[in-house]
């Protein structure tokens, strides 16, 4: 936000340097990010003076050039070659002396140097208005009034104004400071705390007077919730034209291009007082009635920027008897504004619901100075005052007379918000006891009234313009802000309390899992959640569930992704194309769907494995990554999270991603899937090597983890015992089945089961296979006996025979 120092000093008579003021504003929380000089004429016309043309003779070597002698107040006149057709002896003219840097009307700089033109020396330049940056005309030199003395700086002649402009990084909650008056109000409070008492100068509206009632415009508000206050007044016989220099300079200083005196007046009030206004051409209001209502869905409407928009049923509009004129609080319509032919103006000043304005502005991708303020909340009590001030200003600079009473639709006055401030809480939150009189003084400087006083604290009434102060903590923050953060002493002692929660925090769990995966050589990636329509139509089984953006940044980013996998494959492809083909990647991200008319977001964890397990070296040969390597990484995660009874099932037939793979199950709950990406999909991403993936449903995983308590115990000091079995099984029986039956049978001393050999061949019957399995047994409190070991192994063997039809292989 840009704040002009000259403008600021209209409300507060400051004699501080801009840098000092900037420091105070920053201390108050209005961070000054920079201070830039401003000149109403770029370059400030430094080096340009009033000259008197003493002689004007024809150039001997050029028909269109003249040689002049010009007195600029130096010891001797300057010889200047000039090509302007209107230059003549006896004229007072602006002269740019050697070394002067001028800026033309487009802002391009050029330096005046000694030169030789067609054989004749020239020691300066007699200037046209475009060369000085004062206009666009180049028809001839500027001829000045004879009253100006020779040598007078042209900066004085043209009343060049200099200013310093603060660039303030305003936080979104500070709606009260989104104007010069608001900044001045805050600055005054800070100065009072420093012992400097200044009067805050509020612009007067005492000259507001209804001259006649010749222009009648009625108002109808259909939704009091969205429009709690609407004011307006008519001004007739205005003359729309150029604004006076002082007003143009104020607007130019903060980057606003002057339009005409009426529009400039509304912008001046907007940036001066913080109240957005709109000026209608009253003669274009059909039926002389404004109706504030929501739009009919699908209505076409062209805004001031020339863009044709389709309105939504929730868009709040200002309409006349036939058509919409404005998107309330956002932007006017193409035919609603003031033009040079306008003679009668209806001025609007209103309060529109912040949420409604924000939704409409976002829906149509519009951001204006008005919507920026309405979205954050303006001062509802200032609507009428700002309207009257703007009307008086327009009278002064555009002529005309006020031709109606002020219409003020304000059915329910908004009461000041009440907060109780406990002194104990002030001391506790700030960490230091602030004198009670100081607290009261600060509150008074902030216009926060004390409605009641007790030993415990203060009852307060918050002014209407402080829409961000709603709680006791907000008031305490305001006290601290004005008191000064630098005035709070910090104790060398640290007081802290230890807290423990049994709940699993999403971010903490992400960090735990990320640490484990990075320890295994995986790299975390982050991808864009926006995808193309092609991705949705190519891979999504239910494309109607995809979430489409209303205003995409580009056609390639028109949808929210439905599957995180494809975002990761883009990263895999990108790296492979840059000769990094051995990849271990993981990503936490969300999938987005529209289900049953509601938006659904599901968080996933994706792992990707491709290329070689180890790089080639003199001790190793390249070995491709394996399905079991990725499976081991996932199982290690489950173990780290305390999920020990995870099983696998074949993929659903409807799975359209994996060529082969399986599902991870925890009881009846699906935790995720794992597999090899289909060749067709890899081809679409220009990937020519196998890619393994694991897709874990992170939200579901956390739900299961929350039900588990991680228990730490001492490592047993008693020895482990290993026993092996060679089991003959049906082809359909998996190691996971063996694993499940084993731990269901023996939970006490069975610690581990491993598959170390698989055999299928001619020596076995058709449909049979042999598993060689090792079992690790251990007792926590004593050494296992042979009898105990044999009994356990027999129990396991019997369970395998009964549950899986297994037999011992001879």
Language model feature labels by segment:
Residues 5, 23, 27-28, 40, ...:
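Glycine/proline-enriched, intrinsically flexible loops and inter-domain linkers
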Residues 118-133, 137-143, 155-164, 168, ...:
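Mobile "lid/hinge" segments at catalytic clefts and subdomain interfaces of large enzymes
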Residues 419-581, 723, 776-781, 788, ...:
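Extended, well-folded interaction surfaces typified by the phenylalanyl-tRNA synthetase beta subunit core
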Residues 49-80, 151, 260, 266-335:
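Conserved mixed alpha/beta core segments that line enzyme active sites in large multi-domain catalysts
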Residues 187, 191-221, 398-426, 432-433:
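Terminal amphipathic helices with adjacent charged low-complexity linkers/tails
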Residues 1-211, 346, 369, 379-380, ...:
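Phosphate-backbone binding interfaces of nucleic-acid-interacting proteins
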Residues 2, 27, 445-448, 468, ...:
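A carboxyl-terminal module marker
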Residues 40-44, 207-209, 497-498, 502, ...:
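Beta-rich nucleic-acid/ligand-interaction surfaces
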């Amino acid at each position: 936000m840009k704040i002009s120092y000259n403008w600021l000093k209209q409300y507060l008579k400051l004699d501080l340097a801009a840098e000092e003021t900037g420091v105070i504003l920053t201390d108050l929380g209005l961070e000054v990010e920079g201070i830039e000089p401003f000149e109403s004429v770029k370059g400030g016309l430094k080096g340009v003076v009033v000259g008197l043309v003493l002689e004007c003779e024809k150039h001997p070597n050029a028909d269109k050039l003249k040689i002049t002698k010009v007195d600029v107040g130096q010891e001797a006149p300057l010889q200047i070659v000039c090509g302007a057709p209107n230059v003549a002896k006896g004229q007072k003219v602006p002269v740019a002396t050697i070394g002067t840097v001028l800026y033309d009307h487009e802002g391009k700089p050029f330096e005046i140097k000694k030169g030789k033109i067609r054989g004749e020396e020239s020691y300066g330049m007699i200037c046209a208005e475009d060369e000085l940056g004062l206009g666009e005309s180049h028809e001839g030199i500027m001829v000045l009034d004879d009253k100006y003395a020779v040598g007078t700086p042209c900066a004085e002649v043209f009343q060049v104004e200099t200013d310093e402009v603060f660039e303030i990084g305003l936080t979104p909650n500070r709606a009260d400071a989104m104007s010069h008056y608001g900044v001045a109000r805050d600055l005054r409070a800070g100065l009072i705390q420093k012992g400097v008492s200044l009067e805050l100068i509020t612009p007067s509206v005492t000259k507001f007077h209804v001259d006649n009632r010749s222009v009648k415009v009625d108002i109808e508000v259909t939704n009091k919730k969205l429009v709690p206050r609407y004011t307006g007044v008519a001004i007739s016989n205005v003359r729309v034209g150029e604004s006076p220099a002082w007003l143009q300079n104020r607007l130019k200083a903060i980057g606003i291009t002057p339009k005409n005196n009426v529009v400039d007046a509304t912008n001046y009030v907007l940036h001066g007082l913080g109240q957005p206004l709109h000026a209608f051409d009253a003669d274009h209001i059909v039926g002389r009635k404004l109706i504030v209502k929501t739009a009919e869905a699908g209505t076409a409407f062209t805004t001031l920027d020339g863009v044709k928009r389709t309105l939504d049923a929730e868009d709040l509009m200002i309409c006349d008897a036939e058509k919409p004129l404005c998107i309330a609080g956002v932007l006017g319509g193409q035919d609603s504004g003031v033009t040079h032919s306008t003679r009668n103006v209806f001025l609007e000043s209103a309060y529109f619901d912040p949420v409604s304005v924000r939704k409409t502005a976002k829906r149509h991708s519009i951001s204006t100075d008005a919507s920026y303020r309405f979205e954050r909340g303006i001062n509802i009590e200032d609507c009428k005052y700002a309207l009257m001030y703007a009307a008086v200003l327009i009278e002064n600079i555009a002529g005309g007379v006020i031709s109606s009473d002020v219409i003020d639709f304000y059915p329910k006055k908004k009461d000041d918000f009440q907060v109780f401030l406990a002194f104990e809480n002030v001391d506790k939150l700030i960490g230091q006891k602030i004198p009670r009189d100081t607290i009261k003084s600060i509150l008074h400087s902030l216009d926060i009234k004390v409605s009641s006083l007790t030993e415990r604290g203060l009852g307060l009434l918050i002014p209407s313009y402080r829409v961000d102060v709603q709680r006791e903590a907000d008031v305490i923050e305001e006290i601290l802000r004005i008191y000064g953060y630098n005035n709070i002493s910090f104790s060398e002692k640290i007081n802290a309390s230890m807290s423990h929660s049994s709940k699993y925090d999403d971010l903490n769990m992400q960090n735990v899992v990320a640490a484990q995966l990075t320890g295994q050589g995986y790299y975390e990636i982050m991808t864009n959640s926006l995808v193309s329509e092609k991705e949705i139509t190519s891979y999504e089984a239910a494309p109607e569930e995809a979430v489409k953006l209303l205003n995409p940044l580009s056609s390639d980013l028109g949808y929210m992704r439905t599957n995180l996998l494809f975002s990761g494959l883009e990263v895999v492809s990108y790296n492979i194309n840059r000769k990094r083909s051995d990849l271990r990647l993981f990503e936490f991200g969300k999938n987005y769907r529209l289900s049953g008319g509601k938006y659904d977001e599901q968080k996933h964890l994706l792992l990707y494995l491709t290329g070689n397990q180890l790089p080639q070296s003199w001790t190793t040969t390249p070995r491709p990554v394996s399905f079991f390597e990725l499976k081991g990484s996932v199982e290690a995660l489950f173990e780290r999270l305390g999920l020990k009874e995870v099983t696998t099932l074949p993929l659903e037939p409807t799975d359209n991603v994996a060529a082969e793979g399986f599902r991870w199950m925890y009881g009846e709950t699906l935790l995720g899937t794992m597999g090899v990406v289909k060749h067709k999909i890899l081809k679409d991403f220009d990937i020519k090597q196998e890619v393994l993936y694991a897709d874990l449903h992170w939200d579901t995983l956390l739900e299961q983890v929350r039900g588990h308590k991680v228990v730490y115990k001492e490592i047993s000091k008693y020895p482990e015992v290993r026993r092996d079995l060679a089991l003959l099984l049906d082809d359909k029986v998996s190691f996971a089945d063996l694993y499940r039956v084993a731990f269901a049978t023996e939970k006490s001393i069975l610690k581990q089961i491993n598959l170390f050999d698989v055999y299928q061949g001619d020596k076995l019957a058709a449909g049979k296979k042999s598993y060689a399995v090792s079992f690790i047994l251990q007792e926590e409190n004593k050494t296992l006996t042979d009898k105990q070991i044999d009994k356990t192994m027999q129990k396991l063997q019997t369970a395998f025979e009964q549950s899986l039809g297994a037999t011992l292989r001879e």
